[in-house]
A protein has these predicted regions:
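Conserved beta-strand -> loop -> alpha-helix junction used to position metal-binding or nucleic-acid-contacting
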Residues: 111-124
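Ser/Thr-centric signal marking residues that sit
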Residues: 12-14, 120, 159
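Acidic, divalent-metal-coordinating active-site segment for phosphoryl/phosphodiester hydrolysis
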Residues: 151-165
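Buried hydrophobic packing segments
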Residues: 101, 123, 159-163
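A structural signal for alpha-helix termini and helix-coil/disorder junctions
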Residues: 84, 107, 126-129, 165-169, ...
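Conserved non-catalytic scaffold segment of RNase H-like nuclease domains
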Residues: 1-114, 129-132, 136-150
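Acidic two-metal-ion nuclease catalytic site recognized across multiple nuclease folds
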Residues: 1-2, 161-210
Length: 210
């Protein structure tokens, strides 16, 4: 897609601290600046192993995924249904989600297409001056409807709506005034670096704000 605001917001939940232990995937599809679809899949991580702290965070347990598809099965569906149309992924603390995808691809020997990654967390730090930039706090502060935190589908939709608002507030995208604007995601002056500037998954920090 070359016109309008088009992207997929994506969120991964993991069963253990290992980035390749994905146990849930959520996506939210945005076409021309509108949320048109939100989906999530439970995923059986390798050997269906979970850590206590990860279960405490998202509430997903081994019995929830014992009959779920593996990550390669879920990724094949996402790739088949969406990736011919979309080449931009948005995530909140994108280095975390990007790392989950890349580690899983390495584990399962999957070929990944070229993806343009954008980060609603880093964008928030550039556009706003709120001090706290967790997904829950930003959505509450900006009046964005909140779902169940740390469930992949709800987090993906919250991220999508947040990113749309960030682009509006930054002036990079004006709905209706410029409907043929080349995809603003590619114009966003946010470039991700493979460094530790984000620290651990920011969605898990300052839980009181969530």
């Amino acid at each position: 897609m070359k016109e309008g605001l088009n992207f997929i917001a994506i969120d991964f939940e993991t069963a253990t601290p290992k980035r390749a232990s994905i146990c849930e995937v959520g996506i939210c599809v945005v076409r021309n600046g509108e949320v048109v679809e939100t989906r999530s899949w439970l995923v059986q991580p390798e050997e269906n192993l979970y850590s206590y702290w990860n279960m405490q965070c998202h509430g997903i347990r081994p019995e929830d995924t014992e009959n779920s598809p593996s990550f390669p099965e879920v990724w094949e569906e996402i790739e088949r249904l969406y990736l011919d149309e979309f080449d931009t992924f948005v995530a909140h603390n994108a280095p975390f989600d990007r790392s989950c995808l890349e580690h899983s691809a390495k584990l399962y020997r999957l070929h990944l297409p070229e993806i343009n990654w954008q980060c609603s967390l880093k964008t928030a730090r550039q556009v706003y001056d709120f001090g706290c930039n967790t997904l829950g706090y930003l959505c509450e502060r900006l009046g964005i409807p909140e779902g169940t935190h740390h469930r992949a589908g709800d987090d993906a939709e919250m991220c999508a709506r947040l990113f749309i608002q960030e682009l509006k507030d930054s002036g990079l995208w004006i709905p209706y005034a410029c409907p043929s604007l080349e995809d603003p995601c590619h114009r966003l002056s946010v470039r991700l670096e493979a460094d530790s500037s984000y620290g651990p998954d920011a969605r898990s920090l300052s839980s009181a704000a969530n």
